[in-house]
């Protein structure tokens, strides 16, 4: 193998070219590659953070839904209790009103009964007086007296 000046010149040119590339071309390429690697790593970590945030948000949403369901159930139970209380109060009020009306009606019936008895007593007294007057008018005849008394008893 012959080593001549051309090969030696090419080797020196190649070494100079490699040194030039290592000094001026390679650092910007490496910087661009490192920058791209950093951007990819940042993107991956950002995606991982976003996934964790999403999982956390889903967990929070699930917890809030559970809490909302519990609160809704509590509100429904309170509404049912309030409804039952209102119904009980209305029933009690209606019962009191019924008792008041019955008591008032009973008092009116008693008053009417007393008035009717008093009226009946007055009529009986008037009939007794009328009967006594008739007996006195016909006091001579004993058979007529017993007949008048029988009629009075029949009228009473």
Swiss-Prot record:
Subcellular location(s) per record: Cell inner membrane
Segments traversing the membrane: 11-31
Family annotation (PANTHER family): ATP SYNTHASE SUBUNIT B (PTHR33445:SF1), ATP SYNTHASE SUBUNIT B', CHLOROPLASTIC (PTHR33445)
Function recorded in the entry: F(1)F(0) ATP synthase produces ATP from ADP in the presence of a proton or sodium gradient. F-type ATPases consist of two structural domains, F(1) containing the extramembraneous catalytic core and F(0) containing the membrane proton channel, linked together by a central stalk and a peripheral stalk. During catalysis, ATP synthesis in the catalytic domain of F(1) is coupled via a rotary mechanism of the central stalk subunits to proton translocation. Component of the F(0) channel, it forms part of the peripheral stalk, linking F(1) to F(0).
Protein family: Belongs to the ATPase B chain family.
Lipid bilayer topology: Single-pass membrane protein
Subunit structure: F-type ATPases have 2 components, F(1) - the catalytic core - and F(0) - the membrane proton channel. F(1) has five subunits: alpha(3), beta(3), gamma(1), delta(1), epsilon(1). F(0) has three main subunits: a(1), b(2) and c(10-14). The alpha and beta chains form an alternating ring which encloses part of the gamma chain. F(1) is attached to F(0) by a central stalk formed by the gamma and epsilon chains, while a peripheral stalk is formed by the delta and b chains.
NCBIfam families per the UniProt record, alphabetical: ATP_synt_b (TIGR01144), PRK05759.1-2 (NF004411), PRK05759.1-4 (NF004413)
Organism: Photorhabdus laumondii subsp. laumondii (strain DSM 15139 / CIP 105565 / TT01)
Keywords: ATP synthesis, Cell inner membrane, Cell membrane, CF(0), Hydrogen ion transport, Ion transport, Membrane, Transmembrane, Transmembrane helix, Transport
GO CC terms: plasma membrane; proton-transporting ATP synthase complex
Protein name as annotated: ATP synthase subunit b
GO molecular function: proton-transporting ATP synthase activity, rotational mechanism; proton-transporting ATPase activity, rotational mechanism
InterPro entries (UniProt xref): ATP_synth_B-like_membr_sf, ATP_synth_b/b'su_bac/chlpt, ATP_synth_F0_bsu_bac, ATP_synthase_B_chain
């Amino acid at each position: 193998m012959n080593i001549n000046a051309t090969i030696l010149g090419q080797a020196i040119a190649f070494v100079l070219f490699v040194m030039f590339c290592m000094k001026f071309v390679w650092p910007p390429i490496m910087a661009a590659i490192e920058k791209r690697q950093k951007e990819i790593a940042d993107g991956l970590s950002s995606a991982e953070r976003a996934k964790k945030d999403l999982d956390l948000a889903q967990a929070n949403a699930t917890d809030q839904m559970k809490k909302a369901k519990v609160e809704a159930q509590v509100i429904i139970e309170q509404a049912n209790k309030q409804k039952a209380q209102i119904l009980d109060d209305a029933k009690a009020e209606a019962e009191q009103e019924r008792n008041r009306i019955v008591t008032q009606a009973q008092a009116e019936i008693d008053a009417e009964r007393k008035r009717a008895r008093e009226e009946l007593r007055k009529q009986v007294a008037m009939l007794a007086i009328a009967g006594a007057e008739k007996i006195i008018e016909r006091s001579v005849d004993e058979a007529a007296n017993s007949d008048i008394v029988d009629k009075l008893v029949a009228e009473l």
